[in-house]
């Protein structure tokens, strides 16, 4: 019986879900806006909200909790240094989900999940191959 089980399985094992949401948290913190399916966005939202709350509380123990959840030290640093200061006066509601139509291949409902008051310049930052590597190879 599924009494009290509120989270979606998303057709994945527990380890796969945990790894997927850790990667999605890191991507959202890095780019401050990502496009994903609507069910994944709805499951990601409370995880990210709790991470931002950890960042606002600060302290070494909270930082270690965030590292164990996300496993990306650069994004944990950004969470505690940048996002914690940005949302210091806001009591929850750090993210928004915007429905973005349906995916062409399988008609899956898509959504954009982003931080409220996000930094517009963070989108696409450090994505793909570096331009330095392409110049050195030539």
Swiss-Prot record:
Gene Ontology MF term list: structural constituent of ribosome
Pfam entry (one): Ribosomal_L17
GO biological process terms held by the UniProt record: translation
Region (Disordered): 118-138
Superkingdom, taxonomy of origin: Bacteria
GO cellular component, one term: cytosolic large ribosomal subunit
Entry keyword set: Ribonucleoprotein, Ribosomal protein
Keyword DNA-binding (UniProt): no
Subunit structure: Part of the 50S ribosomal subunit. Contacts protein L32.
PANTHER family associated with the record: LARGE RIBOSOMAL SUBUNIT PROTEIN BL17M, RIBOSOMAL PROTEIN L17
NCBIfam families recorded: L17
Family membership noted in the UniProt record: Belongs to the bacterial ribosomal protein bL17 family.
The protein, known as: Large ribosomal subunit protein bL17
Record lineage: Bacteria, Pseudomonadati, Pseudomonadota, Alphaproteobacteria, Hyphomicrobiales
């Amino acid at each position: 019986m599924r009494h009290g089980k509120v989270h979606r399985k998303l057709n994945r094992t527990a380890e796969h879900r945990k790894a997927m949401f850790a990667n999605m948290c890191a991507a959202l913190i890095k780019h401050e806006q990502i496009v994903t399916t609507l069910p994944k966005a709805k499951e990601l939202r409370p995880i990210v909200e709790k991470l931002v709350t950890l960042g606002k509380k600060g302290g070494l123990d909270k930082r270690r909790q965030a590292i164990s959840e996300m496993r990306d030290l650069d994004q944990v640093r950004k969470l505690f240094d940048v996002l914690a200061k940005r949302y210091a006066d806001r009591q929850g509601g750090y993210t928004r989900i915007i429905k973005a139509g349906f995916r062409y291949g399988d008609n899956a409902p898509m959504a954009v999940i982003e931080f409220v008051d996000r930094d517009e310049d963070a989108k696409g930052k450090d994505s793909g191959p570096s331009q330095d590597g392409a110049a050195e190879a030539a």
